[in-house]
Amino acid sequence: MRAIAVDIDGTITDKKRRLSLEAVKALRGAEEAGVPVIMVTGNILCFAMATSVLIGASGGVVAENGGVLHINDEVRVLGDISKAEMAYSHLKGIYPVRKVQFSDLRVSEIALTRDVPADTVREALRDFDVEVYDTGFAIHLTDPSVNKGSSLEILLESMGIEMEDVMAIGDSENDLEFIEAAGFRVAVANADPELREMADYVTSAAHGEGVAEAVRRFMGW
C-alpha cells in the first residue's frame, strides 16, 4: 500500500461533522511511516485543505466530488458548473430547493439541502446532464464527466502511484467510484449498503474510529 485516500464527511467525521481524533492520530501515523494521505471529498476545497493541513496529509486533495483538484500547490477545476446551474434553475421552479451554506465557494457543482428527497430530485432532472449524489449531508448536482475516482486517478498519476496501490476509505454513494477503483476497498461500519457490499473490508467501528481501525490493521500496528 503506497497511499491512503479517505473521504471526510461521515468517514473521518461523525454525524455532527466532528472530526475524530482517533482518525487523525492514525492518518498522521501513516504519514510518518511514509504513506501519503489524500483527502477525497464532496465538500469545498478550502474545507478540504483545512482538514488536510490539520491532519498533516501530504497527498493532495480531491474536492467537490472530483470537480476540483489541488495538486502540488496548483488548483485545477475539472467540473463544468454550468450543467448544475441549468439543472438547479429547472429544479427550483418545481420544488422549494435551497443551496447549502457557503455555496458561493463551489466552482464545479451545486450542493442542496436535503429538504427534497434525492430520488425526487433525480426524477426531476432525468433529462439534464448531471449526476445526483445524496451524501447524507447534502444533495449534490455534479458534472457526470468527473467523479471522485476519475479525479483521484489524475492526482495519483502526478504522484507516480497506481490505483491498485491505494487503500480507499468511504461511507456514502458519492464514494463508490473511487472505492471501486482502488486496490484495497474499505467501508466504515456506517457506510451505505452498496459500498459495504463492494468493500474488501468493513470496519467494526463507525466513522473516524473505523478509519483508525482500518489504517492500524493494514499498516500492521
From Swiss-Prot:
Family: Belongs to the archaeal SPP-like hydrolase family.
GO cellular component: cytosol
SUPFAM superfamilies: HAD-like
Gene Ontology terms for molecular function: magnesium ion binding; phosphoglycolate phosphatase activity
Protein name: Phosphoglycolate phosphatase
HAMAP family: GPH_hydrolase_arch
Cofactor: Mg(2+)
Catalysed reaction equations from the record: 2-phosphoglycolate + H2O = glycolate + phosphate
Annotated source species: Methanothermobacter thermautotrophicus (strain ATCC 29096 / DSM 1053 / JCM 10044 / NBRC 100330 / Delta H)
Pfam hit, one: Hydrolase_3
Residues noted as binding substrate in the record, renumbered to the chain: 148
Highest taxon of the lineage: Archaea
EC number: 3.1.3.18
Active site: residue positions: 7
Presence of the UniProt keyword Magnesium in the record: yes
Sites where the protein binds Mg(2+): 7, 9, 171, 175
InterPro entries per UniProt: HAD-like_sf, HAD-SF_hydro_IIB, HAD_sf, PGPase
Stated role: Catalyzes the dephosphorylation of 2-phosphoglycolate.
Keyword tags: Carbohydrate metabolism, Hydrolase, Magnesium, Metal-binding
